[in-house]
Amino acid sequence: MKPAEEVLGAVGFSVLSVRPGDTCVTMGVSDLPVVAPSIYLSLMESACVAALMEYLDSGETTFLTHSSLEIVGSAAAGVEIRANARVINIDGRELTFECDVYDGER
């Protein structure tokens, strides 16, 4: 990976058009027809990976080891949701991201 001072502040984005299969009711999580928490997490992880693409050396990759998720709204099938991720801390090989997910324009 490139030096920490180059990677700190890197930003990535990811977009998903919510399908019926992405909802809590379809995944058996609850009876609500809204985006399942695991889908939000996957979208954020995708944005984190996108943030690092130009900073990783050939053969390097990254994966999620810890997360904290607070959901303050919901989206239903047919809605397009977007995730932003920004590298806010680097401690050795551990990177910390700040992420948010929203629908519509910001």
Question: How would you name each of these model-derived features?
Answer:
Residues 7-13, 39, 66, 80-82, ...:
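Intrinsic-disorder/low-complexity, polar/charged segments enriched in Ser/Thr/Lys/Arg/Asp/Glu/Gln
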Residues 15-17, 68-70, 84-86, 100:
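Residue-level recognition of well-ordered beta-strand positions that form the cores
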Residues 9, 76-77, 86-106:
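HotDog/MaoC-like acyl-thioester-processing domains
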Residues 2-37:
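Catalytic strand-loop segment that frames the active site of acyl-thioester-processing enzymes
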Residues 19, 24-27, 55, 67, ...:
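Short, functionally important structural connectors and interaction interfaces within domains
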Residues 48-82:
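Hydrophobic beta-strand-centered segment that forms part of the acyl-chain substrate-binding groove
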